[in-house]
Amino acid sequence: MKKISLLLASLCALFLVACSNQKQADGKLNIVTTFYPVYEFTKQVAGDTANVELLIGAGTEPHEYEPSAKAVTKIQDADTFVYENENMETWVPKLLDTLDKKKVKTIKATGDMLLLPGGEEEEGDHDHGEEGHHHEFDPHVWLSPVRAIKLVEHIRDSLSADYPDKKETFEKNAAAYIEKLQALDKAYVEGLSQAKQKSFVTQHAAFNYLALDYGLKQVAISGLSPDAEPSAARLAELTEYVKKNKIAYIYSEENASQALANTLSKEAGVKTDVLNPLESLTEEDTKAGENYISIMEKNLKALKQTTDQEGPAIEPEKAEDTKTVQNGYFEDAAVKDRTLSDYAGNWQSVYPFLEDGTFDQVFDYKAKLTGKMTQAEYKAYYTKGYQTDVTKINITDNTMEFVQGGQSKKYTYKYVGKKILTYKKGNRGVRFLFEATDADAGQFKYVQFSDHNIAPVKAEHFHIFFGGTSQEALFEEMDNWPTYYPDNLSGQEIAQEMLAH
């Protein structure tokens, strides 16, 4: 028995050595990817240069996945690990802390792409105090063909930088696949640009980027599962909602059970269909030769069942309350005095990031979300708003230091009151007023802060107004509002934070 055990151990060792030698002999990279879109895009770019492995199979939610010890070892033994975004694979940041960065290269497929807040977002003009706060970001960018192209491009560029000897192959493979994605994008543009109904109702709120890029509106509903019938109370609510908005289809992420489809059809007069979020492919899909492009073509066909039918704009079941303090709606009695300590810290102007193009994605999002201005018009608007030559402001409990043209000027300040201003849209904002006690403060004699808050709280960013004439003169300034964020944030981090408002 002992001899048999030794023999088996020897054979296993020989097998492992053989596998290792084979890996070296074929010269291929070993790339581990997280879930299906990342796997597909990486495989298309790498081609025959790599063995690309999928970590998360069908039936497992990438958000909730926790890598086993075996999976961690697999990643640690890889040449490259590719994931989409930490907002999707929430377990990745912890994993990255354990990886040997010299041995395993990592690629974040979204790169410098900015993400939208995970919840609904109200957009509007920059009448200070109108924006809400969200801190979770939507990672489902792969469901928009035009953004899928950006993911492929970033994977291509990252692999090329890490393995320059294979750059030509990566570029050739990526170009061929991007051509197919461009054709898919064209099909979406042609299929949806003349949509008669621009709203679609889905049980899985994963299609925000698709809707945004192709002129549609995603309306998400809750309490509906493809596997089970809704409760009588929920069915009554759905029936009323469907009839009120004349909804023809409700989409789920997989085929609804026949019982659910029959119930919704009979009671609510609405049909069900699939919008596949493409987080995985089933074994049946794979055997049938399905892939990212073919599934996205099916999604387009499903969407057109709604968009080709005329109907009124579909409103969310529960309208979001936009008349909040953050959006500039409050009672006068709620406004409280604040001290300079609320703004204490080291701050940087955002104007340089606007000038170098870091905020261009922000303006593109705003243009698509609001439809009020083009990207170029938004950039011009914020250029005027952010413009300043004061690059940094360092604040203590009673002093402000302004860095201007490489020179520093520091003064002591006292709080002198607050002023409620009413904007054209009807919402309001509060400016908190400070005055320098130094006679030589010049253009920094009078200072006003606006940061979307109306009572004592630590500011996360602020707009500032300063001048040497009077506080009253500053009240008239509505077009130029130099804006500052903590100086330890990168331009990319600030841009992402802006989208969270």
Where are these regions (language model features)?
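Short, solvent-exposed loop/hinge segments that bridge or flank secondary-structure elements
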Residues: 329-332, 337, 348-399, 437-455
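Extracytoplasmic metal-acquisition and chelation regions
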Residues: 5, 19-334, 341-349, 436-443, ...
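Positively charged n-region of N-terminal signal peptides that target proteins for export
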Residues: 1-8
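An exposed acidic His-Trp-rich patch
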Residues: 412-458
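Mid-length scaffold segments of soluble, non-membrane domains
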Residues: 200, 383-428
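His-enriched metal-coordination microenvironments in redox/metal-binding proteins
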Residues: 425-426, 453-474, 478
